[in-house]
Amino acid sequence: MAITQNYGTGRRKSSTARVFLRKGTGNITVNDRPLDEFFGRETARMIVRQPLELTKNTESFDIMVTASGGGTTGQAGAIRLGIARALVEYDETLKSELRKAGFMTRDAREVERKKVGLHKARRATQFSKR
């Protein structure tokens, strides 16, 4: 018998996360490492667990994640979106609850490009009156 699993893709900044949800005991592995080992910061771990805590599914699933690109904050946000999408694939009734909490919305903010003639995206050289 094939293992039933639910899948969700999440993106944030330049990070992408592929999330696989299986019935289990609440183990979360990111790139073959436990969640606590992969993310050093507690805030990143908290962000990843938010959809599960909201839907009271913390101990119901084993989650396997492949995260690539970007930094830790971007990857944590991508994983959160992926978990939320996978939960909706598992149970459609959770969608309104997750949407209300803002976990179903892709954060569209991206890094603004650097412009020619400026130091950074908006930082210009100091203005001299004389």
UniProtKB/Swiss-Prot annotation:
This is Small ribosomal subunit protein uS9. Gene3D superfamilies: 3.30.230.10. GO terms for biological process: translation. SUPFAM superfamilies: Ribosomal protein S5 domain 2-like. It comes from the Bacteria. GO terms for cellular component: cytosolic small ribosomal subunit. Keywords: Ribonucleoprotein, Ribosomal protein. Belongs to the universal ribosomal protein uS9 family. GO terms for molecular function: RNA binding; structural constituent of ribosome. The keyword Ubl conjugation does not apply. It comes from Xanthomonas euvesicatoria pv. vesicatoria (strain 85-10) (Xanthomonas campestris pv. vesicatoria). The lineage of its organism: Bacteria, Pseudomonadati, Pseudomonadota, Gammaproteobacteria, Lysobacterales.
